[in-house]
Amino acid sequence: MSKNVIHRSFANLYHRLTRGNFGTEKWKKQFAYFGEGTRVDWPANINVGGGTLHFGDKTHILSGSRIANFVEGGKITIGDGCFIGYGFSLLNASEVTIGNHVLFASQVLITSENHGIDPESELSYMAQPLVSSPVHIGDGCWIGEKVCILPGVTIGKKCIIGAASVVTKDVPDYCIAAGNPARVIKKYNFETHNWEKV
């Protein structure tokens, strides 16, 4: 039997025994709020840092997630009833707010921070101070696979972001956006009850 088969068998057994929820009790003590019925599947890397984490009720985060506050006072809020797919990354040096009932496909990246990029500085880009701006995602959105949401972006409620999009600008309520950089391609018309091209 190969090492990979043994590893997968052990991982599957461990997942069943722990219900994929390893470490949740430890994390709960660090949270500003950890909602009823909320679940974080193992393995996960969660770093409260010097900030706060608030996870709403009945939210499920699949395995491979990385959620981190990098600065004192950083604030991460994830609402009620969210489903977050495998390999989710949320990197915060400001504030990230995710509304209620938001659906994330796998390997989504949300970041409110970036390294300074002053080429005249004596410091390398890695050593330059972080530049940050809040990110907000409205209620009921659907964020596609491998989407990147960059600092300063607000996505309105009930929006859909197409797979592999890079969101650099705000997306209004009830819109579909896609591409790199993402642009609005459709908006819902409540009079015709249809998604219409923009």
Per-range role (PLM):
Residues 109-111, 115-116, 130:
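Extended, non-globular alpha-helical segments
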Residues 91-93, 97, 145-160, 165-168:
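Beta-rich strand-turn-strand
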Residues 124-135:
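A short acidic, glycine-rich active-site loop
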Residues 117-121:
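Short acidic/His/Gly/Ser-rich catalytic and metal-binding motifs that mark active-site loops
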Residues 1-111, 138-139, 157, 173, ...:
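Domain-scale signature associated with acetyltransferase and cell-envelope carbohydrate enzymes
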